[in-house]
Amino acid sequence: MKLLKILSLVCLSISIGACAEHSMSRAKTSTIPQVNNSIIDQNVQALFNEISADAVFVTYDGQNIKKYGTHLDRAKTAYIPASTFKIANALIGLENHKATSTEIFKWDGKPRFFKAWDKDFTLGEAMQASTVPVYQELARRIGPSLMQSELQRIGYGNMQIGTEVDQFWLKGPLTITPIQEVKFVYDLAQGQLPFKPEVQQQVKEMLYVERRGENRLYAKSGWGMAVDPQVGWYVGFVEKADGQVVAFALNMQMKAGDDIALRKQLSLDVLDKLGVFHYL
């Protein structure tokens, strides 16, 4: 009888010890990602602290929305899309046969806002150079009625185009939030927008920026100069080697004279710190 009691006490002691060790192990493993995430957040925040601008950087991996920056409320605030609307414009135009991906849009010989725009472009080339007149011509071909119905069909932003079919994304009334932007480009990356698969693939290829290892970056910039305060965008997604897609949207207040390359550079720096698109 005494032997049974001794054995019972030994087993109980071992069981308690094992449970305590398991609890300590769980506590240790659960704190590691929290520390890492905290360090990552601090490193990203340091990037935004270096710039004197209201800004937010939003990421979306198909499940989670994350926000970084100096003014996180901008993530849910609507702004004109500026040239990031070229993505939707191209999708609508190609889907409705208003242009092809190989068509040459001829320059009319008149000086444009940037001298680099004074030449012929395909839609893809105009996407890369952000050539506004080419996409204004595409919008005029689409026309106000079709443009309005298409924006409603795909649920783009506030779906308002007003009376000027070649100005509404530059001056308003069309607006979109950074969260809406990341979800839109995420669906494009996955081929899940309500457009033909081949159309989505064509537009996706127009957005290609660079490759690092097996990871690929696709993006479009935007600068709304016709509104006050001015707004800057850098919107896109990274396709990682394992097939994961991470969409992102930088939205920031800008002013005349700001560095035109800041939006892209800041986005690349943030993506690097987040471990999404590392510098090699």
From Swiss-Prot:
Q: What is the catalytic activity of this protein?
A: a beta-lactam + H2O = a substituted beta-amino acid
User: Which terms are listed as keywords in the entry?
Assistant: Antibiotic resistance, Cell membrane, Hydrolase, Lipoprotein, Membrane, Palmitate, Plasmid, Signal
User: What happens on changing residue 225 to T?
Assistant: Reduces catalytic efficiency about 100-fold with respect to oxacillin, and about 5-fold with respect to penicillins and imipenem
Provide the activity regulation entry from the record: Activated approximately 3-fold by the presence of 0.1M NaHCO3.
Q: What top-tier enzyme class does this entry carry?
A: hydrolase
Q: Name the catalytic site residues.
A: 83
Q: Where is the lipid attached (S-diacylglycerol cysteine)?
A: 19
Q: What is the effect of changing residue 113 to Y?
A: Similar catalytic efficiency to wild-type with respect to penicillins, oxacillin and imipenem
Entry superkingdom: Bacteria
Question: EC number(s) for this protein?
Answer: 3.5.2.6
Signal sequence span per UniProt? 1-18
Please outline how this chain is modified post-translation: Carboxylated on the epsilon-amino group of a lysine, with the resulting carbamate functional group serving as a general base. Probably N-carboxylated at Lys-86 at neutral pH in vivo and undergoes complete N-decarboxylation, at pH 4.1, in vitro. N-carboxylation at Lys-86 probably increases catalytic activity under physiological conditions.
Briefly describe its induction.
Expressed from an upstream promoter, P(Aba2), in an insertion sequence, ISAba2. Expression level is positively correlated with gene copy-number in clinical isolates.
What membrane topology is given? Lipid-anchor
Which residues does the annotation say bind a beta-lactam?
83, 86, 130, 221, 223, 263
Q: Which positions are lipidated as N-palmitoyl cysteine?
A: 19
Q: Which Pfam family, any one of them, does this sequence belong to? A: Transpeptidase
Q: Which GO terms describe its cellular component?
A: plasma membrane
N6-carboxylysine carried by residues: 86
Record's family? Belongs to the class-D beta-lactamase family.
Quaternary structure, per UniProt, is: Monomer. Dimer.
Protein's recorded name: Beta-lactamase OXA-58
Question: To which species is this protein native?
Answer: Acinetobacter baumannii
Output the lineage of the source organism: Bacteria, Pseudomonadati, Pseudomonadota, Gammaproteobacteria, Moraxellales
